[in-house]
Amino acid sequence: MRRPVKPTFSLNVERPTRAEFRRAVWSKRNAASPGRNGINYLVYKKLPAAFDLLYSIILKAWDGDIPDNWAQAAVVLLFKDEDPADPANYRPIALQSCSGKIFFSIWAKRLELFMLKSGYFKRAKQKGFLSGVPGCSEHVATLKAALRDSRSSYRQIVVAWIDLKNAFGSVSHNLIQFALEWYHVPTHLADIISTYYEMLVATIETKDWSSKCFVYEIGVFQGCVLSPLLFSMVFNLLLDMLSLRTEEAGYKFKGCEVTIHDLAYADDLSIISRSITEAQRSLDLIDRFLRWTRTMAAKPSKCRSLALKYWSNADDRAGRTRFVERAYAPFDPELKIAGQVMKFIADKSFKFLGWKVYHHLSESKQKKEIHKEFVEYMDKVDGTFVHGFMKLWLYQHYVVAYLAWPFMVYDLDISWISELERIANRYLKKWAGLYARAVTSVLYRPRDMFGLQLHSIVAFYKRLQIGQSFMLKHSPDENLNRIYLSMLARHGALERVWKPSPAMEKLEWQVEQKLRFGGQADRACMGFGRHKRKLALAERKRRVLEAQASSFFAELNLLDIDKAMQGCFLRFTDAEPFDLSWRHLIGTRNPRLITWVLNASINSVVTPDLRKLWGLCPSAECLLCCHSQASLFHILVGCPVALRQLRYSWRHDSVLATLEEPLRRRLGQHNASPCVEEKRTIQFHSANKPSGKRLERRLPTKNAYCSI
């Protein structure tokens, strides 16, 4: 492999400006764990003296004079899984000084920009630790599209997932220096990193004991802001070697001109090939690279393989003979890594970046797991000893958040999603104090329309899928753009699954039409102006999701219009909506009052006319005014006796609001009129001479008293 050419984009090694330093400080989270000195980021944000002192220290450290405490770390062990007695099942997290992390975060941002602008980091391959890149979802979407394409075109595909043994802790410091030199990083930054890694010391701290201070001779700190980028540079050496085999060994899509071979997210690497032979050659290349590093090694026990092939005659699969005429089925490719055969994905699933993969590529087991865990979460929330509206808050912020990732990576049919929503509706109505047959729109419609504005599971799934399609279409990775276009052009597949791509295209078209309408409604009224308005990508995505939410609320309104009695809240448009924010739901408001308001908005409060309708009483008269039809609308707004007794405070407020408008207009006109100030001068006169205008005190006359 040849060394890459020198880049035209140079890395900025100048001292950071005060504005750049301020952005680095304010980008940090206040809740981040501090180092051994106990000083967190909030100190530098709130104290100007500490801010100025740290800025002067960073300017001095920019020349290579790094403080000793920046290279000291307290290592905390976090348990991962399996056996707690095995030290290998713990993840070491280094807690470092916040001032040092601010210094290295400035360098990390500049180094990342340098690697991307120079073309050393390829977005289509390595997506780990890159700012603004949803790497997990993009790689999962790419691999799913490849498996779906091979299945629809009946072509062979071989996938191998490689896991490294202690990836971050096995990178030698000499290898880091080699990667910096290989990618033409300026010597100024390379010397700073070399000095920093020569000073690394750490102690392991637990609740019961602390170890002695030891030198960190190999590996990078997990918790240092610079470590992920340095590891990616070392791992990028392997990706550059594998990229030479992309056209030769990679899998080529049938519907678009895209060839993929290796997908990496940090140390998680997957190899996609068109044949077993080419896949094994790529694995041999990985073995050769790991042996060259002398410190890094694969972990065969956690590596997996999968192969899919079109079978058209009698064959032997999974250890037994099955006679299949035409089938597209998996088989064990028996790939080897580090001299050991990789395990085949059989009945047990393999998790790739949070996506569970089965050998049959079916998602029925995932549906059962999601359904089971969702019911367990709802039962757990229902069993807590808090009032119902606090349970609604737990559902809104925790239970729905659990469904976010499965809804993004799995293709689920709407009927199955609706079943989850029916289960959720039973719990939500119970917690809100609604009747079992109450209309469900009161749970999901906006608060200004007498609703709780909770997350609808169906709408939440569509929102995530539309956001996923938007990401595929506008991703900087060109391969994802082409895959999205092929998905949009494909028809007939997955009929039961709701297709987000056409829905996203329609919503984006609506956003574009609104922009055009804004151009036609300006002062010129001539359509587009001289410059066409363009939205940023984040703003465009936000408007697309807002359009999706508006369409969902419009569907709820159509359902409420169909409900003649429970949709009566639509007639309360002039009434001031009840404040149903979380601050009042779980804090200041009485839960019984909120429950009554919700039931009243859907006409579920027991009234005389409903009792007569149900056959519980012979008459539906109002108990106050003896009106013949005492409906909920009459009780709330139309009873004259209640009006005289000042029970309708909202009605008096509406009268005052009607009087307020002309008074406000009159006061505005009076305040806008010019005010002429009267100039008064003091007139002096001699004491002997009377003034020209004699002031006399006039007493009221008799006629004046008579007029009064």
Task: Give residue ranges: language-model regions.
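Catalytic palm active-site di-aspartate
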Residues: G35, Q72-V75, R91, Q126-L130, ...
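Active-site metal-binding core of divalent-cation-utilizing nuclease and nuclease-like domains
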Residues: L616, G668-I708
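Extended C-terminal regions of large enzymes
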Residues: L420, Y435-C617, E621
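Short, conserved micro-motifs composed of acidic
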Residues: S210, A298-K348
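Short, conserved catalytic/metal-binding micro-motifs enriched in Asp/Glu and His
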Residues: A31-L42, R91, D163, L180, ...
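Conserved pre-catalytic core of RNA-dependent polymerases
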Residues: P4-L237, L632-R647, P662
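Short Cys/His-based metal-binding microdomains
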Residues: S456, W614-P662
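Basic, alpha-helical interaction scaffolds
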Residues: E334-L412, G467-L480
